[in-house]
Amino acid sequence: MASTFASVRRKVPYVVSGISTCYCTFRFICGLGKCEDVSMEPTIQHGDLVLISPYYVNHQLLQKGDVVFCRSPKNPRAIICKRLVGMEGDTVYNDEKGFEEYVDKGQIWLEGDNKCCSIDSRTFGPLPYGLLISKVALRLWPPERFGFLELPKRFRMPPPCST
């Protein structure tokens, strides 16, 4: 009995270390996410498995055009997947309401790529930055669609002018 207890006691630091490493990795560096609706099609399809990284959110490294996971403003238990279209200080055209909206300090504007099937900032307005969870870094599944998400043309920077 004593040797069993001693054996378990020797393994506890390794188990605690492993659990701590896994927690920190998934909490601060990367994790897995699954898109559960059609609002981001064709970029991300219903059921796609993606690699997500909270690092970009935690260090405020997001850019317009990034796809993000965010807590729903209507149901904090629900997580939504949308494209970051506007950041603080931006003016965004809301085609649902037919006018421009200003994104205040500490807020973001999210929209789905599949606009006809997306409930997003066009419906509920700008969101607090604090609702962001992570950036979608890579599509993992299905294998035939594996890869980085392409940034739509409207978010790409024009090439520098040559003189």
Name these PLM-found stretches.
Residues M1-I79, F99-Y102, L131, A137-T163:
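Protein maturation boundaries and topogenic segments
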Residues K34, C116, D120-S121:
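Juxtamembrane cytosolic face of transmembrane helices
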Residues L49, V67, T91, Q107-I108:
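Residue-level marker of beta-strand positions
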Residues N58, V92-Y93, C117-S118:
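Short beta-strands and strand-coil junctions in structured, solvent-facing domains, enriched
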Residues E88-N94, L138-P142:
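Short, conserved beta-turn/loop elements at beta-strand boundaries and strand-helix junctions
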Residues G112:
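Phosphate/adenylate-binding glycine loop and adjacent helical scaffold
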